[in-house]
């Protein structure tokens, strides 16, 4: 068995007193599966890629938010102008009297829901705080670590305020059409999605929305929906005993033959080959 790559805090933190730092990925390249001896928050700003977290694949794009525990294993593949930031932290070094465990999913163990979404409002506010945090955590002046931790606490609370599950925006949300579209697509795993109907409901131009989506994500709307469905199929093939025909239906494909064609084109192997190969990991 190949040796598991592990990223070490000594390579990312300026001292053993530093609790928080920011690691930019402009852009994020393909990165082999790895773990850490620190934790991280991952926020995606634009582009797209495949993020595999604890053997579960996610097609990620702008607004995706992940809480990664040190023991989690993850990797990045099939990246396309993927821009993200990692806010890395050492739980045992945090001194601020905050309910970190209540505020950060999986703070003390690899558990809880790791994947969330941020809309444009939350992203804008988070970007501002992260900019301050990045500046403060790189300073070699008195109280820089304390200031960085205060900003990290502010960021954590801000994310709590603005995050939502990938397929469910709050009903009172003031997020942009693009945020609402991505949420609607995530909620359309099993059912057909009609862009013209969505645009009618939102009173917006289909052409403009298509352009906006591609500009921010690097994909067409159909490509994104297809890849989200394939990611879900990969997860079900590995972690369930459903028949391939049933998985096809669960992932929004009315015809299992067409599902097999799409799956093979996206992954390079048939659903049955993929299931056989990945069942050996469990």
Curated annotation (Swiss-Prot):
It is found in: Cytoplasm. Its main location: cytoplasm. Keywords: Activator, Cytoplasm, DNA-binding, Repeat, Rhamnose metabolism, Transcription, Transcription regulation. InterPro entries: AraC-bd, Homeodomain-like_sf, HTH_AraC, HTH_AraC-typ_CS, RhaR_RhaS-like_N, RmlC-like_jellyroll, RmlC_Cupin_sf, Tscrpt_act_RhaR. GO terms for molecular function: DNA-binding transcription factor activity; sequence-specific DNA binding. One of its GO terms (cellular component) is cytoplasm. Binds DNA as a dimer. This is HTH-type transcriptional activator RhaR. It comes from Shigella flexneri. The lineage of its organism: Bacteria, Pseudomonadati, Pseudomonadota, Gammaproteobacteria, Enterobacterales.
């Amino acid at each position: 068995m190949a040796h598991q790559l592990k990223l070490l805090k000594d390579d990312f933190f300026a001292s053993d007193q530093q609790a928080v730092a920011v690691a930019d990925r402009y852009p994020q390249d393909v990165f082999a599966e790895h773990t850490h001896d620190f934790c991280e928050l991952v926020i995606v700003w634009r582009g797209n890629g495949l993020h595999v977290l604890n053997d579960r694949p996610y097609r990620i794009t702008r607004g995706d938010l992940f809480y990664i525990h040190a023991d989690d294993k993850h990797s990045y593949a099939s990246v396309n102008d993927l821009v993200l930031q990692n806010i890395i932290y050492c739980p045992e070094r945090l001194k601020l009297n905050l309910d970190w465990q209540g505020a950060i999913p999986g703070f003390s163990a690899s558990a809880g829901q790791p994947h969330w979404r941020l809309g444009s409002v939350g992203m804008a506010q988070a970007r501002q705080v992260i900019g301050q945090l990045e500046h403060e955590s790189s300073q070699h002046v008195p109280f820089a670590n304390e200031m960085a931790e205060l900003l990290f606490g502010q960021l954590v609370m801000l994310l709590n305020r603005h995050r939502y599950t990938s397929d469910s925006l709050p009903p009172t949300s003031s997020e942009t059409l693009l945020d609402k579209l991505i949420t609607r697509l995530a909620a359309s795993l099993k059912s057909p999605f009609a862009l013209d109907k969505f645009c009618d409901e939102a009173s917006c131009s289909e052409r403009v929305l298509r352009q906006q989506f591609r500009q921010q994500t690097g994909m067409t709307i159909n490509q994104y929906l297809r890849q989200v469905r394939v990611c879900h199929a990969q997860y079900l093939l590995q972690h369930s005993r459903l028949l391939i025909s049933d998985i096809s239906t669960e992932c929004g494909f009315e015809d299992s033959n067409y599902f097999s064609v799409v799956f093979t084109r996206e992954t390079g192997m048939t659903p049955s080959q993929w299931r056989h190969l990945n069942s050996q990991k469990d």
